[in-house]
């Protein structure tokens, strides 16, 4: 088995050097190959996560969210049984992030957060897209670190600026089999609601979200 895997890895490197395989697809296939040999264990005895989040616009305030054992188990359970397709896993990601936002809202003022940037005075806990995308990226990184993602990888935050005064940020994932990127956008919704996930090309053009 190990010899066959080494041969397959060598062929993939050869295809990459010849330009017949893009770097994104190479690393995606390499990760899938590694998972097929030793899938990441979701260890029940690992320490509970401590998640740094921010809020109050442009990450003006920070806090550390510490899920209880019961809360974290509910997050992990969103990925059971394992997703049979990338589409199914994206739905799991939506539910898990919604749950993590709810947990954060129990420990911080972010339970007050409303979709977009409403006009609020003296309203601690409201988040702009910088806060939201930063937190979403951290949630995604946690899910990846704990071995919960099999069809996707986490990459840098997505950014768009179609107009000078219309900058926007979101979390971002890449589908490993295809190399397709998706924005994970929580800013449009109230705290604790499943974020929108949209193909990055559509998100860059501000197309309507698929489930809006």
Where are these regions (language model features)?
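Acidic/histidine-rich, surface-exposed loop or edge segments in extracytoplasmic proteins
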Residues: 55, 59-60, 67-84, 113-122
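Short N-terminal segments immediately surrounding and downstream of signal-peptide cleavage
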Residues: 44-61
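Mid-length scaffold segments of soluble, non-membrane domains
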Residues: 97-152
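Sec/Tat signal peptide C-region and signal peptidase I cleavage site
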Residues: 39-43
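Hydrophobic/aromatic-rich core segments of domains that either
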Residues: 141-203
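N-terminal, post-signal-peptide region of Sec/Tat-exported proteins
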Residues: 70-104
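N-terminal secretory signal peptides that target proteins for export/translocation
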Residues: 1-23
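Bacterial N-terminal signal peptides
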Residues: 27-36
